[in-house]
Design a protein with these regions (language model features):
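Domain-level recognition of nuclease-like catalytic cores that cleave nucleotide substrates
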Residues: 94-130
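Acidic-basic catalytic patches of nuclease active cores, encompassing PD-(D/E)XK
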Residues: 1-37
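Short, glycine/acidic-enriched loop or turn micro-motifs at the edges of active sites
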Residues: 39-41, 63
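Short acidic/glycine-enriched loop/turn segments that link adjacent beta-strands
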Residues: 41-44, 114
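Conserved protein-kinase catalytic-loop segment immediately C-terminal to the catalytic Asp
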Residues: 47-50, 107-109
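Conserved catalytic cores of phosphodiester-cleaving nucleases, focusing on short active-site segments
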Residues: 27, 48-67, 84
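Mg2+/Mn2+-dependent nuclease catalytic core
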Residues: 64-87, 93
Length: 130
């Protein structure tokens, strides 16, 4: 099945992997430890879970080809945010001691299959479910 972009699932997954790899590298260079990639529970997935200085960052990665009609940032709408928060809550149930959490968004722009630009938004949204 193809979306309106005309890009098939395999191509989207490949682009997504390139974006996630780039963000993991970015996080590692900034002192984060990658705890988990593609954490999935019923109803949701978190692309990257990383930790630094006792803060767990739940990172949503959106990858787009250069010149796409919609930005990667626009794709993380309130519905997507709610799914991410619920998935993060499921992840945190397995942690015995309280932790500080935040929700970050990484927007990766590709050109010819290579990372052209990476924008990282710390604390891009919160768990308040407005």
């Amino acid at each position: 099945m193809q979306r309106k972009t005309g890009i098939d699932h395999t191509q989207r997954r490949k682009a997504g992997n390139i974006g996630e790899d780039a963000v993991c590298g970015f996080l590692a260079r900034h002192g984060y430890e990658i705890i988990k990639r593609n954490f999935t529970v019923r109803g949701g997935e978190i692309d990257i879970i990383a930790e630094k200085a006792d803060i767990i960052a739940f990172v949503e990665v959106k990858t787009r080809e250069h010149g796409s009609l919609t930005s990667a940032e626009e794709a993380v709408d309130p519905v997507k945010q709610r799914h991410i928060v619920q998935t993060a809550q499921a992840f945190c149930k397995g942690i015995l001691e309280p932790v500080c959490c935040r929700f970050d968004v990484a927007a990766v722009e590709l050109e010819n299959g290579r990372v052209k630009k990476l924008r990282y938004y710390v604390n891009a949204f919160d768990a308040s479910m407005k």
